[in-house]
């Protein structure tokens, strides 16, 4: 523990600068010394010597050098008493170290400060010198600044404890005296005195300010009374001024009342005159209606006459077709009867031919039996030839089938190649379309306006800018450039599908601006521009909830926004966006459009492009159209990126189709080569087949010739009859065929004529119905014409008997009012000019009767107020200003004083609180440290400090005291115990104060050897550990003090007898 403490002490000492420590003290003719110089170490210094050797004079000289008064040293009454007997002056010179961070003005004094005080019989002088001994200052303020800088208070017992102060404490058993010692040693006494002094000064200053403020209260009361009088007088003046103004207003109110009547009459005339064009418009409307109905009547009569002629001709034509149809039916019936008769005759001949053939067969069978052997050989040969023909025929058929199969494959290959070519064309067309869209989007990205009309709209906007003075209000457009989407670009394509060309339209405020804008459009070569006329002054429409479709799906109105309310109003009026609903897909859109028949629902648009709506009872669904990039997107970058990706996909599809086309061409060439080869093989097989068939035919002819050579007259006759009958059958069948063709033609003719007759009859029915309908319309037109003529006569009578007479009467009244206004203006101008009335502000619309009543009431009030006051308001104001000037400066000065006193009081309260807290902490610290030092001798103790009672009591318990009684008075201790406890108390105080050096004189008196040894060891350890410079003066032997490099011992010379 000792070693670790020594290491910590050494590290602290290395950081210590030693600034403010005493290097040496020189005295000349001071007390008992003629010339004495003592040098001190920076750490612990012991000075010993016999009584009378002048040890205590060193501390006295140190105190005198730092400005202490003679009584403060308790060694003399005046400073001149310190001059050695027989001398006329005394000099005390102290050299201080001045280096490190805590140095005092090192740039002036250097590393050493010399303080020299010269004392004479009549005066004293203090001089501060630098390290070279050169004089720097002789002012006491400089010395005081030096002392405060290093915190050197030689009157503080913790800095310099003289032998008198030590004895005073040792012999004091009074708790109040001990408290005074502690209070002074810890500088609490000094701070407390300063705070008390400040509080007294503040109290006195506050009382002075209160007294000064009381001196001006009578004047302030008088000022307050004057202020009330002035305020009342000002009100009287104000009433008089208002009375004059009201009189002037009354004069002009008659004029303004006539103006009001003139305005009302003018408005009445305007309204009456507005009835003229309205009435005339109705007359013109009815006149136009009459003329239109007359024209329609003329046309309808001509139409009825024409229809009558056409119906007559149609009846004749219908009768003609009816006769033709009857004739054709009769011809068809006659041909049918003849055809049936011929068919029966042919059938009879065929029956006779079959009987003859049976007879010939019987004869031939008999002949065949005779020539069976020869025929057997011929049949074998024929059979062989037939087999060969069959083989070749099979080969030819197989080759033909293979050829047809490959031809079909080649045909399919051509169709596939044509399909691929069509796909390539479609993909190329799609790619060109996407590239065009990308170029358009890039152009829109540069200028969004071009999305709604291209370059034409740019030219149009430039034309509008050139002609902007011709417009009553600047046109708004194109509408699409003023429309934004609220929640992203999700519904962009659906919104654009719904609004369509309305996005390209422009809005103007009236018809004149519409014509001007049309001229600008022609100038910009923008034909067919859609122009909407709408009142710009109308606020944004507020659509009630019950007027929109009740569905959770959004409407177009809910997903769009605009910086211009007119644009939204136009979209509501023109397109009904509040009734157009958006849906995610086809199924949801179908459920919304056709599910519940929602009220106020106009149309439903889906994300995939379907449009659904009702037209009467019919459900209508329009398929998606070709999708183009949306023009309403906030940013076109994403669309351009998607289209570029789509264009890249189309290019990949084109490349794949080109590769498939090449493969298809190669396959087609192979198939065509195979077809050519098969054709060649088939031609060879057909040649072989022809040869075999000719050979087989020749053999059959030979056999037939042999058979004919046989003598068979009966067979020949029968054959001739059969041939004759067959020829007749062929002749009759040919005739039947011709007859059948004639029958078909007759049937077709009859059917055609019958259909024409039916069609003609149906057409005639329509013509007759049209004729009847035209007659009904003609009657209705005649009735409407009579009604329109009656309405025209009615409005003409209103114009003649009502409108024009009312206007004439109103104009006569207007002229009378003008004359009356002129007279009233002349009378009012004599009272005051109209500009004076205008300067009072805008007219509030008061009538002459109201102003007359106000004037009467104000005259009565003014009369009452004038009776209460005798002084003039100017005199009152002069008195008020005089008194205000008299006390204004004083009041400001007193207020400033009070604010400063309050700030000082707040600061004093804050410092007093800090002082009490520090005093409480010092009390605890003193008890802990005192008990710690006592413990080194095995003694325990406690210090009780009462700031309220100003007492300090010490309790000490000795280790050998078996009774455990606590000694509460130092007089009850032995001399050594009292000296040791005094030392412990002093060390505790030392730890609580800071100073560059400390000095103690005769600290070990009345101590026994053991207490003295313990006290010296504790004192030396504390001094070395504490770090500041220490000076110990004792008359006793200090050989028992341990040797240390930081301990310096000096022996004073013995006194001369």
Curated annotation (Swiss-Prot):
It comes from the Eukaryota. GO terms for molecular function: ATP binding; ATP hydrolysis activity. GO terms for biological process: double-strand break repair; double-strand break repair via homologous recombination; response to X-ray; sister chromatid cohesion. InterPro entries: P-loop_NTPase, Rad50/SbcC_AAA, SMC_hinge_sf. Disruption phenotype: Delayed root growth in seedlings. Hypersensitivity to genotoxic stress such as UV-C, X-rays, methyl methanesulfonate (MMS) and mitomycin C (MMC). The keyword Iron-sulfur does not apply. Residues 818-828 have a biased composition (Basic and acidic residues). Residues 135-448, 633-904 form a coiled coil. Residues 22-1047 form the Zinc-hook domain. GO terms for cellular component: chromosome; nucleus. Residues 449-632 are annotated as: Flexible hinge. Keywords: ATP-binding, Chromosome, Coiled coil, DNA damage, DNA recombination, DNA repair, Nucleotide-binding, Nucleus. Induction: By methyl methanesulfonate (MMS) treatment. Residues 818-845 are annotated as: Disordered. It is found in: Nucleus; Chromosome. ATP binds at residues 49-56. Expressed in seedlings, rosette leaves and floral buds. Belongs to the SMC family. SMC6 subfamily. The flexible hinge domain, which separates the large intramolecular coiled coil regions, allows the heterotypic interaction with the corresponding domain of SMC6, forming a V-shaped heterodimer. Forms a heterodimer with SMC5. The SMC5-SMC6 complex is composed of the SMC5 and SMC6 heterodimer attached via their hinge domain and from the non-SMC subunit NSE4A or NSE4B. Core component of the SMC5-SMC6 complex that promotes sister chromatid alignment after DNA damage and facilitates double-stranded DNA breaks (DSBs) repair via homologous recombination between sister chromatids. This is Structural maintenance of chromosomes protein 6B. It comes from Arabidopsis thaliana (Mouse-ear cress). The gene is SMC6B.
């Amino acid at each position: 523990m000792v070693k670790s403490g020594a290491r910590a002490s050494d590290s602290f000492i290395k950081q210590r600068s030693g600034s403010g420590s005493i290097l040496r003290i020189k005295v000349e003719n001071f007390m008992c010394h003629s010339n004495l110089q003592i040098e001190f170490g920076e750490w612990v210094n012991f000075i010993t010597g016999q009584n009378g050797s002048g040890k205590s004079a060193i501390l006295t000289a140190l105190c005198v050098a730092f400005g202490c008064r003679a009584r403060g040293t308790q060694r003399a009454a005046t400073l001149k008493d310190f001059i050695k007997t027989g001398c006329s002056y005394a000099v005390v010179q102290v050299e201080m170290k001045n280096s490190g961070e805590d140095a005092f003005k090192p740039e002036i004094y250097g590393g050493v400060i010399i303080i020299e005080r010269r004392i004479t019989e009549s005066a004293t002088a203090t001089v501060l010198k630098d390290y070279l001994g050169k004089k720097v200052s002789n002012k006491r303020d400089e010395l005081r600044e030096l002392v405060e800088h290093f915190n050197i208070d030689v009157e503080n017992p913790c800095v310099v404890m003289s032998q008198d102060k030590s004895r005073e404490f040792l012999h004091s058993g009074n708790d109040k005296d001990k408290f005074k010692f502690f209070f002074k040693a810890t500088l609490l006494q000094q701070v407390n005195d300063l705070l008390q002094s400040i509080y007294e000064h503040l109290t006195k200053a506050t009382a002075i300010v209160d007294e000064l403020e009381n001196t001006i209260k009578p004047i302030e009361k008088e000022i307050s009374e004057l202020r009330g009088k002035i305020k009342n007088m000002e009100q009287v003046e104000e009433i008089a001024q208002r009375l004059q103004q009201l009189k002037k207003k009354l004069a002009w109110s008659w004029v303004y009342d006539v103006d009001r009547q003139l305005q009302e009459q003018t408005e009445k005339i305007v309204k009456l005159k507005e009835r003229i064009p309205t009435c005339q418009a109705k007359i013109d409307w009815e006149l136009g209606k009459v003329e239109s109905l007359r024209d329609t009547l003329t046309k309808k009569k001509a139409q009825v006459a024409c229809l009558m002629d056409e119906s007559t001709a149609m009846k004749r034509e219908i009768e003609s077709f009816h006769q033709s149809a009857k004739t054709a039916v009769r011809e068809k019936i006659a041909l049918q009867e003849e055809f049936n008769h011929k068919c029966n005759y042919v059938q009879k001949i065929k029956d006779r031919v079959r009987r003859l053939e049976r007879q010939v067969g019987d004869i031939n069978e008999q002949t065949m039996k005779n020539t069976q052997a020869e025929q057997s050989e011929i049949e074998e040969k024929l059979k062989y030839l037939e087999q060969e023909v069959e083989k070749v025929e099979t080969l030819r058929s197989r080759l033909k089938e293979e050829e047809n199969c490959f031809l079909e494959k080649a045909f399919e290959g051509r169709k596939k190649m044509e399909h691929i070519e069509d796909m390539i064309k479609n993909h190329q067309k799609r790619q060109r379309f996407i590239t065009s869209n990308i170029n358009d989007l890039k152009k829109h990205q540069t200028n969004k306006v071009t999305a709604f009309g291209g370059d034409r709209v740019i030219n149009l906007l430039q034309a509008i800018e050139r002609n902007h003075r011709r417009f009553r209000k600047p046109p708004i457009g194109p509408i699409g450039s003023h429309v934004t989407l609220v929640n992203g670009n999700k519904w962009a394509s659906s919104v654009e599908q719904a609004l369509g060309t309305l996005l390209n339209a422009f809005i103007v405020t009236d018809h004149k601006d519409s014509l001007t804008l049309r001229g600008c459009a022609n100038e910009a070569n923008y034909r067919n521009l859609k122009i909407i006329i709408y009142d710009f002054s109308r606020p944004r429409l507020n659509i009630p909830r019950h007027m929109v479709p009740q569905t959770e799906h959004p409407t177009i109105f809910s997903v769009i926004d605009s910086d211009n309310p007119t644009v939204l109003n136009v979209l509501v009026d023109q397109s009904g966006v509040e009734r157009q609903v958006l849906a995610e897909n086809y199924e949801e859109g179908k459920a919304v459009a056709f599910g519940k028949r929602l009220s106020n629902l106009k149309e439903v648009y889906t994300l995939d492009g379907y449009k659904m709506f009702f037209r009467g009872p019919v459900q209508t669904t329009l398929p998606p159209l070709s999708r183009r990039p949306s023009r309403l997107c906030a940013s076109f970058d994403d669309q351009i990126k998607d289209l570029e990706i789509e264009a890249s996909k189309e290019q990949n599809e084109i490349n794949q189709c080109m590769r498939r086309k090449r493969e298809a061409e190669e396959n087609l060439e192979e198939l065509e080569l195979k077809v050519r080869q098969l054709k060649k093989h088939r031609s060879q097989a057909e040649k072989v087949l022809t040869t075999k068939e000719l050979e087989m035919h020749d053999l059959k002819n030979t056999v037939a010739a042999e058979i004919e050579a046989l003598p068979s007259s009966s067979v020949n006759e029968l054959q001739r009859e059969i041939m004759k009958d067959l020829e007749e059958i062929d002749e009759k069948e040919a005739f039947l065929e011709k007859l059948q063709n004639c029958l078909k033609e007759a049937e077709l003719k009859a059917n055609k004529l019958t259909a024409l007759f039916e069609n003609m009859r149906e057409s005639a029915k329509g013509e007759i119905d049209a004729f009847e309908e035209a007659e009904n319309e003609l009657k209705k037109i005649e009735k409407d014409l009579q009604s329109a003529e009656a309405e025209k006569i009615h409005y003409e009578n209103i114009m003649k008997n009502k409108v024009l007479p009312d206007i004439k009467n109103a104009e006569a009244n207007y002229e009378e009012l003008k004359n009356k206004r002129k007279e009233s203006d002349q009378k009012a101008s004599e009272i005051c000019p109209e500009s004076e009335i205008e300067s009072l502000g805008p007219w509030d619309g008061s009538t002459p009767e109201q102003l007359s009543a106000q004037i009467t009431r104000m005259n009565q009030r003014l009369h009452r107020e004038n009776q209460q006051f005798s002084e003039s308001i100017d005199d009152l104001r002069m008195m008020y200003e005089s008194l205000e000037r008299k006390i204004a400066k004083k009041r400001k000065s007193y207020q400033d004083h009070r604010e400063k006193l309050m700030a000082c009081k707040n600061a004093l309260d804050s410092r007093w609180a800090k002082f009490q807290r520090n005093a409480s902490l010092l009390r605890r610290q003193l008890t802990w440290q005192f008990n710690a030092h006592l413990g080194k001798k095995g003694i325990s103790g406690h210090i009780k400090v009462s700031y309220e009672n100003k007492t300090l009591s010490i309790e000490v318990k000795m280790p050998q005291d078996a009774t455990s009684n606590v000694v509460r008075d130092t007089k009850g201790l032995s001399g050594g115990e009292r000296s040791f406890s005094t030392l412990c108390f002093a060390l505790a105080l030392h730890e609580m104060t800071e100073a560059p050096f400390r000095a103690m004189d005769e600290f070990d008196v009345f101590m026994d050897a053991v207490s003295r040894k313990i006290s010296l060891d504790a004192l030396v350890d504390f001094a070395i550990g504490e770090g500041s410079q220490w000076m110990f003066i004792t008359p006793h032997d200090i050989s028992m003090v341990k040797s240390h490099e930081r301990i310096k011992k000096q022996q004073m010379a013995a006194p001369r007898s």
